[in-house]
Amino acid sequence: MNIFKKTIFSVLFSLLIIGNVNADKIKIGTEGAYPPWNSKDASGKLIGFEVELAYTLCRYIGQQCEIVEQDWDGMIPALIMRKFDAVMAGMSITAERQKAINFSQGYADEVASLAVMKGSDLEGMDTPEGINLTLGGSGVKKTLKTLTGALAGKTVCTQTATIHQNFLESGDVGKINLRTYITQDEVNLDLASGRCDVALAAAVAFTDSVSYTHLTLPTKRIV
Protein backbone atom coordinates (compact mmCIF):
# COMPACT_ATOMS: atom_id res chain seq x y z
CA MET A 1 0.00 0.00 0.00
CA ASN A 2 1.57 3.29 -1.07
CA ILE A 3 1.57 6.50 0.98
CA PHE A 4 -1.30 8.05 -0.99
CA LYS A 5 -3.53 5.01 -0.40
CA LYS A 6 -2.66 5.01 3.31
CA THR A 7 -3.48 8.71 3.47
CA ILE A 8 -6.84 8.33 1.74
CA PHE A 9 -7.70 5.38 4.00
CA SER A 10 -7.02 7.62 7.01
CA VAL A 11 -9.35 10.31 5.67
CA LEU A 12 -12.01 7.71 4.85
CA PHE A 13 -11.78 6.26 8.34
CA SER A 14 -12.17 9.73 9.85
CA LEU A 15 -15.27 10.43 7.73
CA LEU A 16 -16.71 7.01 8.60
CA ILE A 17 -16.46 7.84 12.31
CA ILE A 18 -18.14 11.20 11.68
CA GLY A 19 -20.81 9.43 9.64
CA ASN A 20 -21.63 7.13 12.54
CA VAL A 21 -22.14 10.14 14.77
CA ASN A 22 -24.15 12.13 12.23
CA ALA A 23 -25.92 9.43 10.24
CA ASP A 24 -28.15 11.73 8.15
CA LYS A 25 -25.51 13.80 6.42
CA ILE A 26 -21.83 14.67 6.81
CA LYS A 27 -21.21 18.40 6.48
CA ILE A 28 -17.76 19.43 5.28
CA GLY A 29 -16.52 23.00 5.47
CA THR A 30 -14.43 24.61 2.74
CA GLU A 31 -13.51 28.16 1.79
CA GLY A 32 -14.43 28.24 -1.87
CA ALA A 33 -11.73 30.83 -2.55
CA TYR A 34 -8.47 28.89 -2.73
CA PRO A 35 -8.04 27.37 -6.20
CA PRO A 36 -7.23 24.75 -7.25
CA TRP A 37 -7.98 23.22 -3.84
CA ASN A 38 -11.42 24.80 -3.53
CA SER A 39 -13.19 27.60 -5.38
CA LYS A 40 -16.44 28.48 -7.14
CA ASP A 41 -17.43 28.44 -10.79
CA ALA A 42 -19.28 31.24 -12.58
CA SER A 43 -22.61 30.00 -11.23
CA GLY A 44 -21.38 30.03 -7.63
CA LYS A 45 -21.09 26.25 -7.38
CA LEU A 46 -18.27 24.98 -5.16
CA ILE A 47 -15.59 23.21 -7.19
CA GLY A 48 -11.96 22.13 -6.87
CA PHE A 49 -9.77 19.19 -5.89
CA GLU A 50 -10.97 19.04 -2.28
CA VAL A 51 -14.63 19.34 -3.23
CA GLU A 52 -14.30 16.47 -5.69
CA LEU A 53 -12.27 14.42 -3.21
CA ALA A 54 -14.85 15.01 -0.46
CA TYR A 55 -17.73 13.77 -2.61
CA THR A 56 -15.68 10.80 -3.81
CA LEU A 57 -14.81 9.78 -0.25
CA CYS A 58 -18.42 10.15 0.86
CA ARG A 59 -19.65 7.95 -2.00
CA TYR A 60 -17.00 5.39 -1.07
CA ILE A 61 -18.26 5.11 2.51
CA GLY A 62 -21.92 5.30 1.46
CA GLN A 63 -22.69 8.59 3.19
CA GLN A 64 -24.54 11.68 2.05
CA CYS A 65 -22.38 14.79 2.21
CA GLU A 66 -22.95 18.51 2.02
CA ILE A 67 -20.14 20.98 1.31
CA VAL A 68 -20.55 24.14 3.39
CA GLU A 69 -18.89 27.41 2.38
CA GLN A 70 -17.09 29.23 5.20
CA ASP A 71 -14.73 32.22 5.31
CA TRP A 72 -11.19 31.07 6.02
CA ASP A 73 -10.60 33.10 9.18
CA GLY A 74 -13.73 31.61 10.73
CA MET A 75 -13.09 28.02 9.66
CA ILE A 76 -11.83 26.59 12.95
CA PRO A 77 -14.35 28.49 15.13
CA ALA A 78 -17.16 27.24 12.87
CA LEU A 79 -15.91 23.65 13.20
CA ILE A 80 -15.76 23.97 16.97
CA MET A 81 -19.31 25.39 16.96
CA ARG A 82 -20.43 22.30 14.94
CA LYS A 83 -21.51 24.29 11.89
CA PHE A 84 -20.02 21.35 10.00
CA ASP A 85 -18.44 18.02 10.90
CA ALA A 86 -15.08 18.28 9.14
CA VAL A 87 -12.90 20.68 7.17
CA MET A 88 -11.33 20.14 3.76
CA ALA A 89 -9.90 23.53 2.92
CA GLY A 90 -6.17 23.37 2.28
CA MET A 91 -5.52 23.54 6.02
CA SER A 92 -1.98 22.71 7.12
CA ILE A 93 -1.49 20.58 10.22
CA THR A 94 0.24 22.62 12.92
CA ALA A 95 0.84 22.11 16.63
CA GLU A 96 -1.14 25.24 17.43
CA ARG A 97 -4.19 24.07 15.49
CA GLN A 98 -3.95 20.62 17.04
CA LYS A 99 -4.59 22.22 20.41
CA ALA A 100 -8.10 23.09 19.22
CA ILE A 101 -9.06 20.48 16.63
CA ASN A 102 -8.14 16.96 15.49
CA PHE A 103 -6.64 16.09 12.11
CA SER A 104 -6.66 12.97 9.98
CA GLN A 105 -3.43 12.07 8.24
CA GLY A 106 -2.70 14.66 5.56
CA TYR A 107 -4.00 13.87 2.08
CA ALA A 108 -1.83 16.23 -0.01
CA ASP A 109 1.33 18.29 0.11
CA GLU A 110 1.95 21.73 -1.31
CA VAL A 111 4.88 24.08 -1.52
CA ALA A 112 4.86 27.76 -0.67
CA SER A 113 6.19 30.47 -2.87
CA LEU A 114 7.23 34.06 -2.54
CA ALA A 115 5.91 35.85 -5.63
CA VAL A 116 6.76 39.23 -7.13
CA MET A 117 5.72 40.97 -10.31
CA LYS A 118 8.05 40.67 -13.26
CA GLY A 119 10.55 43.50 -13.24
CA SER A 120 10.67 43.72 -9.45
CA ASP A 121 14.07 44.33 -7.87
CA LEU A 122 13.45 41.09 -5.94
CA GLU A 123 13.09 39.03 -9.10
CA GLY A 124 16.62 37.66 -9.02
CA MET A 125 16.73 36.95 -5.29
CA ASP A 126 18.37 33.62 -4.51
CA THR A 127 15.93 31.42 -2.58
CA PRO A 128 17.06 27.81 -3.07
CA GLU A 129 14.49 25.04 -2.89
CA GLY A 130 14.56 22.35 -0.23
CA ILE A 131 15.64 24.41 2.76
CA ASN A 132 13.88 23.08 5.85
CA LEU A 133 13.46 25.99 8.25
CA THR A 134 12.51 23.64 11.08
CA LEU A 135 15.89 21.88 11.09
CA GLY A 136 18.20 24.83 11.69
CA GLY A 137 21.84 24.66 10.61
CA SER A 138 24.05 26.84 8.44
CA GLY A 139 21.96 26.37 5.28
CA VAL A 140 18.84 27.63 6.99
CA LYS A 141 20.67 30.54 8.58
CA LYS A 142 22.09 31.55 5.20
CA THR A 143 18.65 31.42 3.57
CA LEU A 144 17.03 33.43 6.35
CA LYS A 145 19.83 35.98 6.14
CA THR A 146 19.18 36.32 2.40
CA LEU A 147 15.44 36.75 3.00
CA THR A 148 15.98 39.23 5.83
CA GLY A 149 18.23 41.40 3.69
CA ALA A 150 16.04 41.28 0.59
CA LEU A 151 12.70 41.85 2.35
CA ALA A 152 13.84 44.57 4.76
CA GLY A 153 11.32 47.40 4.65
CA LYS A 154 9.27 45.71 1.93
CA THR A 155 5.50 45.35 2.02
CA VAL A 156 4.82 41.62 2.19
CA CYS A 157 1.26 40.40 1.71
CA THR A 158 -0.37 37.13 2.72
CA GLN A 159 -3.72 35.63 3.68
CA THR A 160 -4.75 35.97 7.30
CA ALA A 161 -4.88 33.04 9.73
CA THR A 162 -2.41 30.97 7.69
CA ILE A 163 0.96 29.37 8.38
CA HIS A 164 2.38 31.95 5.99
CA GLN A 165 1.23 34.76 8.27
CA ASN A 166 2.69 32.93 11.26
CA PHE A 167 6.05 32.64 9.52
CA LEU A 168 6.14 36.31 8.53
CA GLU A 169 5.23 37.35 12.08
CA SER A 170 7.86 35.08 13.65
CA GLY A 171 10.65 37.61 13.18
CA ASP A 172 12.69 35.17 11.09
CA VAL A 173 12.66 37.54 8.11
CA GLY A 174 13.39 40.72 10.04
CA LYS A 175 11.48 43.98 9.79
CA ILE A 176 8.85 44.00 7.06
CA ASN A 177 5.59 45.79 6.48
CA LEU A 178 3.08 42.95 6.74
CA ARG A 179 -0.36 43.23 5.16
CA THR A 180 -2.93 40.48 5.61
CA TYR A 181 -6.09 39.77 3.64
CA ILE A 182 -9.24 37.72 4.11
CA THR A 183 -8.87 35.86 0.79
CA GLN A 184 -6.00 34.86 -1.48
CA ASP A 185 -7.66 36.67 -4.38
CA GLU A 186 -7.25 39.93 -2.48
CA VAL A 187 -3.55 39.18 -1.98
CA ASN A 188 -3.09 38.55 -5.69
CA LEU A 189 -4.98 41.70 -6.68
CA ASP A 190 -2.91 43.94 -4.43
CA LEU A 191 0.31 42.31 -5.62
CA ALA A 192 -0.71 42.97 -9.23
CA SER A 193 -1.70 46.56 -8.44
CA GLY A 194 1.62 47.33 -6.76
CA ARG A 195 0.34 47.68 -3.21
CA CYS A 196 2.49 44.68 -2.26
CA ASP A 197 6.17 44.29 -3.06
CA VAL A 198 6.01 40.54 -2.56
CA ALA A 199 3.41 37.95 -1.54
CA LEU A 200 3.72 34.63 0.27
CA ALA A 201 1.27 31.79 -0.32
CA ALA A 202 1.03 28.26 -1.63
CA ALA A 203 2.75 28.17 -5.01
CA VAL A 204 -0.47 27.10 -6.74
CA ALA A 205 -2.11 30.34 -5.61
CA PHE A 206 -0.07 32.24 -8.20
CA THR A 207 -0.18 29.86 -11.16
CA ASP A 208 -3.23 31.50 -12.78
CA SER A 209 -1.17 34.54 -13.76
CA VAL A 210 1.90 34.59 -15.99
CA SER A 211 2.82 37.96 -14.50
CA TYR A 212 4.20 36.44 -11.30
CA THR A 213 7.76 35.35 -10.74
CA HIS A 214 8.16 32.64 -8.13
CA LEU A 215 10.79 32.60 -5.41
CA THR A 216 10.18 29.10 -4.15
CA LEU A 217 10.17 27.96 -0.52
CA PRO A 218 8.25 24.80 0.47
CA THR A 219 5.29 25.29 2.81
CA LYS A 220 6.29 22.43 5.10
CA ARG A 221 9.49 24.32 5.83
CA ILE A 222 7.64 27.22 7.44
CA VAL A 223 5.04 25.65 9.73
Show which residues each predicted segment covers.
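Sec/Tat signal peptide C-region and signal peptidase I cleavage site
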Residues: I18-A23
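Solvent-exposed coil/turn segments that connect beta secondary-structure elements
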Residues: E31-A33, Q70-D73, M91-I93, A108, ...
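Extracytoplasmic small-molecule ligand-binding "clamshell" domains
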Residues: D24-M91, K99, T180-Y181
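Bacterial N-terminal signal peptides
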Residues: S10-L16
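Short helices/loops that flank or line small-molecule/ion binding pockets
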Residues: Y55-Y60, V68-E69, D73-V87, A100-N102, ...
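Bacterial N-terminal signal peptides that target proteins for export
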Residues: M1-F9
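A conserved helix-loop-strand patch within extracytoplasmic ligand-binding domains
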Residues: S92, K99, F103-V156, A161
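Conserved small/polar residues in nucleotide/adenosyl-binding loops
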Residues: T213-T219
